[in-house]
Amino acid sequence: MSVLTSLLLRGLTGSARRLPVPRAKVHSMPPEEELGTLEKAIALTSCFVSLFLPAGWILSHLEDYKRPE
């Protein structure tokens, strides 16, 4: 990297380093009800099925999607 490029990059990023970053004022409370083991298992299973079942079906039927040559 040339000296000119490094000076240009330093000039562009130098002003951004001096800007204050506002802190987010996010406060949350603990949950009213804890999730049970069964509810967590159902949620994890539904996420797994909704993500991996369509992908697995497409991959298993990949030959059907190929054009005959």
Swiss-Prot record:
Ranges facing Mitochondrial intermembrane side: 61-69
Alphabetical GO biological process terms: mitochondrial electron transport, cytochrome c to oxygen
Pathway given in the UniProt record: Energy metabolism; oxidative phosphorylation
Keyword line: Membrane, Mitochondrion, Mitochondrion inner membrane, Transit peptide, Transmembrane, Transmembrane helix, Ubl conjugation
Main subcellular localisation: mitochondrion
Family: Belongs to the cytochrome c oxidase VIII family.
Protein name, as recorded: Cytochrome c oxidase subunit 8A, mitochondrial
Underlying gene: COX8A
